[in-house]
């Protein structure tokens, strides 16, 4: 069976090897699909992430090419000349050639005859005499939709200063730290516009496809067909087309998820990584690359600027920025100086003591009723990404932690608690070691149950859900987004997908149903992730003329992550988290490696690995 391969180098001298070298049966591509710069990137991926050549190559080459996909084309009729002297009895030809002249390259021969009543005989005659010709035109299978024109927004003084600081920066690596609603997207667009006018290209990365409807709407509305979109929901043919458009210079602005970083952009001048704190920029499939590291390498390779944008940067990125490894640019105020929405922490232990066993606190329920009466919209957020069944006491909020690693232990169905860092196990106690309560349970609730509860208590509310189940179909995120934007629903229930990037002026209440879900992940970044997600979700409220309100439900309201999030105090949170990381030796003070072993005999495998 023939095997596909890539030629990376040519050697004139004979190479002696211990294996049989097979002949090349055919060369699939007339022109190289891998450039010298690509080879440098491939070698970086191999050395940095310990992957095979072919795994690195596949990141750069779309699946469509590997499966033999080609550009889709059609033959259109193109005008050449209207000199009819060579045609005898040319009556009636002038009307035909004038129509083609007005619509050159627009219609196929079949469309001209069937839809516009043009005689096939006359078309063939005009082709025969060289007055028109049939020409192949590439048909792109995606992204043909027209978008409303996006008008440039007037910049605030702070935005103008940020743009100037970035453009004048001698450093190519820049952290743009801007509070939610501060206008980071408009800053991105102005920077992209400058790069494009210089004849260069730009890449704008977003964490996942859920964010792209609004980003696409704005960027396509501003830059039109010059935008290429690249993400996992495209078919192989569509991915090939977008790759081809970028390679041929037909699209200079790329918007996509992490894989878009590998597109063959011509004269790359700018890479923007929006919401840089998101863990979706790290690939969990081979090769397990970190997009930010790849972007930094490309920046050194091509001399382009890289902007990491976030309201809540990772501890590592902020540490690098304040220690001078990258330039720090800040946007500290919302557009029109709108206030950040007021955030309230609700102690769910008190709710339980008062006899309320609903997933909604009395405060959240009352606020939901008020907003619905005013015709305002609500977002209910349930953080289930990386969801882990931790065990907690509902009476006092105690969570069963590992004494060695200071992270929550995970509940397993055999009744044991396991630390996924050091492997420590212990049987789940029946009583809380802190308060002696019997009300010890593992934690969990899904979006479907939340929807049921809303329908039970707020019967007239119109509800939309945005989660993995409701967004499997193509363009489903955009349909839900557009429906909520158009006011077709009062309440949007969602997971991580609703936490950022969405701008709904009529949303005045955000309810975070359980801050404890992210706070008790078995991960040293649990506090950081909680601070980030709460700040990001809170930023969805009060983005219009009306003030917003955020209600956070938790069994541990005293936790420093929630207390700093309530005040939108990133700097003090950073100082606290930084101190803890230093004590524990966690990044940026050390590196954590996960080494997986696969074998039939567990004891033998342990010996080999140790």
Which residue stretches match the model-derived regions?
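Cys/His-rich short segments
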Residues: 364, 373-457
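Accessory, non-ATPase domains that flank or precede helicase/AAA+ motor cores in DNA-metabolism machines
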Residues: 1-310, 322-338
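Conserved nucleotide-binding/hydrolysis modules and their immediate coupling elements
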Residues: 1-33, 109, 416-421, 435-440, ...
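Conserved helicase ATPase core of P-loop NTP-dependent helicases/translocases
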Residues: 235-246, 465, 471-494
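Conserved interdomain linker/interface between the two RecA-like ATPase lobes of SF2 helicase motors
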Residues: 297-298, 305-308, 314-394
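Conserved RecA-like helicase motor core of SF1/SF2 enzymes
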Residues: 274-288, 292-293, 485-490, 495-544, ...
